């Protein structure tokens, strides 16, 4: 197969591994800088140009679209879909998963366990918002943040009020969530491919920190997940419409709670921790399911 990898940086671990795994399995892998591709939208024959030439003959596309380029990245991916190229994850699903609020609303509607969550812009009754999520300690998140940036743990109602007021002053939409103390600063990243969790790891925040992101100095280790956690991760990915996803779960006293569903999960942490060839399994999934004109939405979304 001829497979495009949409990525800003061919040197990133995840991009390198996908190219390696695809090449080893006999595919032609082409890395395309998402922002440098440009499109002919209104022709009877949809096209994407790159470095002065049309991109042609692709069977599948692997989107590795960073959060900051979601809008343009999804537009390029949608154009590939219009051209009948099979996407590993569809543009509609990626856009959906990048909207944290919409994601939680969809997961909640399907009865998937979530932390109690409030959403606000400039609430006229801050104490009531704080009470809504069972009071302090609580976590406040900026809607657009990634890698643990824009996430604050407030230990007291006073601290929570100050932080909410500060974000209001910045005209930010915020999420206010109950703090799951029993998780002990750890979460579980379940790596879903198709309808299986193919690998999972525990991420433990460094001492004195509550954010377990590896970018924040969190430490990854092997973990055996429960059947309930496995089912939750697979269902969460399915609700979002993602074939490949990193589902972040907290262990709480009332079962697994989904924190986030990531449409472009990094491979380095999970491969190094588990020793599994995750990139190879992703390519294998493409071989089984990919092929021209196999996209469900046909670029409609």
Curated annotation (Swiss-Prot):
GO BP terms in the entry: protein modification process; SOS response; translation
Classification via InterPro entries: ATP-grasp, ATP-grasp_RimK-type, ATP_grasp_subdomain_1, RimK, Rimk_N, Rp_bS6_RimK/Lys_biosynth_LsyX
Enzyme class: ligase
GO molecular function annotation: ATP binding; metal ion binding; ribosomal S6-glutamic acid ligase activity
Binding of Mg(2+) 2, residues: 260, 262
Ligand binding (ATP): 141, 178-179, 187, 211-213
Domain of life: Bacteria
Keyword Transferase among UniProt keywords: no
PROSITE patterns for the chain: ATP_GRASP
Coiled-coil ranges (or none): none
Database matches in Pfam families: RimK, Rimk_N
Name under which the protein is recorded: Probable alpha-L-glutamate ligase
Organism: Pseudomonas putida (strain ATCC 47054 / DSM 6125 / CFBP 8728 / NCIMB 11950 / KT2440)
């Amino acid at each position: 197969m001829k497979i495009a990898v949409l990525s800003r940086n061919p040197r990133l671990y995840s991009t390198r591994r996908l190219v390696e795994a695809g090449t080893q399995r006999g595919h032609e892998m082409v890395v395309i800088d998402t922002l440098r591709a440009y499109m002919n939208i209104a022709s009877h024959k949809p096209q994407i140009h790159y470095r002065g030439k049309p991109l042609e003959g692709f069977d599948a596309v692997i989107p590795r679209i960073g959060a900051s380029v979601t809008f343009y990245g999804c537009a390029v991916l949608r154009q590939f879909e219009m051209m009948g190229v099979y996407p590993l994850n569809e543009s509609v699903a990626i856009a959906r998963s990048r909207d944290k609020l919409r994601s939680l609303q969809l997961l909640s509607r399907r009865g998937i366990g979530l932390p109690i969550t409030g959403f606000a812009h400039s609430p006229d009754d801050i104490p009531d918002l704080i009470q809504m999520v069972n009071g302090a300690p609580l976590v406040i998140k900026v809607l657009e943040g990634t890698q643990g940036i824009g996430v604050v743990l407030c230990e007291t109602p006073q601290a929570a009020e100050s932080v909410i007021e500060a974000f209001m002053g910045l005209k930010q939409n915020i999420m206010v969530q109950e703090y799951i103390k029993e998780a002990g600063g750890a979460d579980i990243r379940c790596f879903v491919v198709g309808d299986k969790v193919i690998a999972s790891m525990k991420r433990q925040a460094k001492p004195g920190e509550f954010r377990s992101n590896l970018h924040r100095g969190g430490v990854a280790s092997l973990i055996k997940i429960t059947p309930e956690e496995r089912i939750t991760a697979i269902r969460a990915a399915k609700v979002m419409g993602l074939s490949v996803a990193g589902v972040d779960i907290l262990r709480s006293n009332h079962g697994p709670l989904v924190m986030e569903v990531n449409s472009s999960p990094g491979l380095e942490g999970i491969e190094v921790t588990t020793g599994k060839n995750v990139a190879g399994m992703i390519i294998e999934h493409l071989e089984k399911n990919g092929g021209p004109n196999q996209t469900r939405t046909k670029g409609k979304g």
